[in-house]
Amino acid sequence: MFRRLLFAALIAAGAVHAAELPEQVASLLQAAHIPPEGAGIVVLRGDTALISHNAQQSMQPASTMKLFTTLTALEQLGPAFRARTEFRTSADVVDGVLKGDLVLRGGADADLNEDVLLHMLQALRNQGIQKIRGDVILDRQLFQPARPDVGQPPFDEYPWAYYNVIPDALLINTNLLKVEMRSTGAKLALVMMPEMDKVGIRSEMKLTDAPCASWEKDWRTPDTSRHGDKIEVVLHGSFPKDCIKSTSIDVLDHHDYLERLLRATWRKLGGSISGQVREADAPVSAAPDAAPVPAPRLLAEHLSRPLPEVLRDINKFSDNTLARALFLSLGSLEADPVLGSRPLAADASLASTPMRAETAIRGWLQNHRIDGNGLVFDNGSGLSRIERATPAQLAGVLQAGLNSLWTPEFMSSLPIAATDGTMRKRLKDGPAALRARIKTGSLNGVIAIAGYVPDANNQLCVVVAILNDEHVANGAGRTVLDGVIDWVARSGGGAYSPGNPSSSK
């Protein structure tokens, strides 16, 4: 606690040449035509602020925002936290017939996919269920609103791309269809997976003589068309001749995706459904004099991987969809030592799950004496035009990570320079290679890094650098940030002296 308070005091006082950037970093900013006010940089070695440049400036953090979400989740939910998906019913099973509704309850399971659904449905068959004489109810009510994706405008010109998928509590396969395209000189063949009930695909793409390697250049946003109870995915644009490529697209409504996957999978197992597949908030038709329904019993369940494994996917690969789901989980779930997780009690004062999630993170920040002024949350992933954070706040989170019970789990979630994740191809020939653990972030006009860099004496430094400027594109911003990391990795055991990373006072 004393370290965090001392850090805040150092930043506020502008201690240790705080306003002055190292010559190496200042030169890189100048070469990239990025003005000093477009950069926010904090470097801490223990209790010493080596650099504090615009530390309190509220900036777009891009995906470094995920650090607020992931460290709060690790400390609030714990490393044993696992999300749940359940099949439940209140109906009896008689001669292979489930005489009532079957509920598929979503619990923000990061690993819910077609194979999990197959095994859960197989568990029903193993219990003797073949026919469902009722509805299958898709319960997404853990999050409020239950469908955060509905009514949201596209973030950019690629609404079908994975990074733009907006999760709900019952998202399966991240709502993606895998499409394989094989062309000859005259014909294009398409294969779409997974197999779904009454969902097909066709192409309106023209075959061209373009190189296969540049196939995405003339790809256009796919869409769907409905014909009665059938859905057709339609591809647009053009595609090279004599080319084989595959891609994943998000074009189906979340309800359609799960319903049609569930129907196809259940049919493969020899099952049938006499009723509808509907959402849990749809009206339930029941006789006025119907007897009280007993508490639903568990028929099948799936638990996600433990939280630290999910964090590695979020931070190493900057997975927006998983980060958004985890952010919402902070506002809807708590850890359970037996079940893995359970829903939080309702809070009438906080109407939406995002509000509860933000309250949870701000409470964690307050407990760690990290000032929340200027911090703006949207979805907790950084894929946002409105999320804001200061370099000092991110540095405070990283310091808290070093003092956490779960420091190893948190640090292991970060990309390793020149090794894996979003840092796999960066800093290969410098002293930070294999040693620095860095969360990256980028948007149009934004590039950022936040993490841990051992210096030349192997003393761990907290490093945050954010650039908000139109000139960060085409690698210019990345060069500056890599220069900051390199400067820290070459620095010695003393406080910073301008232009000399190895000097000590």
Predicted stretch roles:
Residues 75-90, 275-281, 407-411:
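Short, well-structured active-site flanking segments
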Residues 50-52, 113, 317-320, 327-505:
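Small-residue-rich helix-loop
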Residues 106-215:
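Polar, glycine-rich mid-to-C-terminal structural blocks
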Residues 203-227, 253, 257, 297-301, ...:
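Short, Gly/Ser/Thr-enriched beta-strand-loop segments that form substrate-interacting elements
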Residues 9-18:
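Hydrophobic h-region of N-terminal signal peptides that target proteins for export
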Residues 47, 61-79, 136, 170, ...:
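Active-site SXXK
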Residues 18-46, 51-58, 118-127:
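Beta-lactamase-like hydrolase cores
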Residues 209-408:
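A small/polar active-site loop signature that marks catalytic segments
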